[in-house]
């Protein structure tokens, strides 16, 4: 890990054997769950991406997807076909811009396009500027939360896992998912390393202010379930 000015960091990773995992290496029969959280895949696993999505759909497993550079570089038809089957899509600004081919400064246009591509909940994180989320009926926003931090490592993953966990625990309550996501991410920021600050079950956490607007209002996003 290389650290720079202002606690910014670059992480150099050697994935080893995980780069070589192929379809035949996955114990499909053991994947018995209600949800799959598909994080960025690389190496040979990137070629198994569609198989994982199709397996989940066939077995009525819900999907949370946080695609990485490898998935976003797949042919557009392949990527869109996969995303059309997911329940929660998590992206940062740059990833959302790559996927939609729209500048991340044009938030309305990005969400209209993302809501066309994905039938589920779409999340776009904006770093220190907060997050915007659409469920096709409402657009939820949280402005950046000022906090003292020790280390940013893992904060994005803490946000994503926190949201999905809260969404599952609350049977699909977006606002609870947002609160748990921010609570987990902000807690992660207070400790060194990616895991040391993660919330434990029942632990209290900081609440944030959520702004909620109807998608039909001012063309904020594409109305999927109005």
Q: Where are these predicted regions, by residue range?
A:
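Short, acidic/turn-prone active-site loops that include or flank metal/cofactor-
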Residues: 15-18, 68-70, 94-95, 145-148
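Acidic, amphipathic alpha-helical patches
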Residues: 26, 79, 149
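Conserved phosphate-binding/catalytic region of the ribokinase-like
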Residues: 72, 104-226
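Structural motif
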Residues: 8-11, 35, 62, 88, ...
């Amino acid at each position: 890990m290389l650290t720079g000015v202002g606690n910014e960091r670059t992480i150099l990773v050697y994935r080893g054997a995980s780069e070589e995992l192929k379809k035949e290496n996955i114990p499909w029969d053991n994947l018995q769950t209600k949800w799959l959280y598909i994080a960025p895949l690389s190496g040979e696993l990137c070629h198994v991406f569609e198989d994982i999505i199709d397996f989940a759909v066939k077995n009525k497993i819900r999907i949370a997807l946080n695609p990485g550079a490898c998935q976003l570089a797949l042919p557009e038809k392949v990527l869109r076909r996969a995303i059309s089957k997911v329940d929660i899509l998590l992206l940062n600004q740059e990833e959302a811009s790559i996927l939609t081919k729209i500048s991340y400064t044009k938030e309305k246009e990005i969400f209209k396009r993302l809501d066309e591509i994905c039938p589920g909940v779409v999340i776009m994180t904006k770093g220190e500027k907060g997050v915007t989320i659409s469920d096709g009926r409402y657009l939820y926003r949280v402005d950046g939360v000022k906090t003292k931090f020790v280390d940013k490592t893992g904060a994005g993953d803490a946000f994503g896992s926190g949201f999905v966990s809260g969404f599952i625990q609350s049977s699909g309550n977006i606002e609870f998912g947002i609160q748990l996501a921010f609570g987990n991410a902000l807690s992660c920021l207070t400790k060194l390393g990616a895991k040391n600050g993660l919330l434990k079950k029942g632990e209290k956490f900081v609440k944030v202010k959520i702004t909620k607007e109807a998608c039909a209002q001012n063309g904020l996003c594409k109305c999927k379930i109005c």
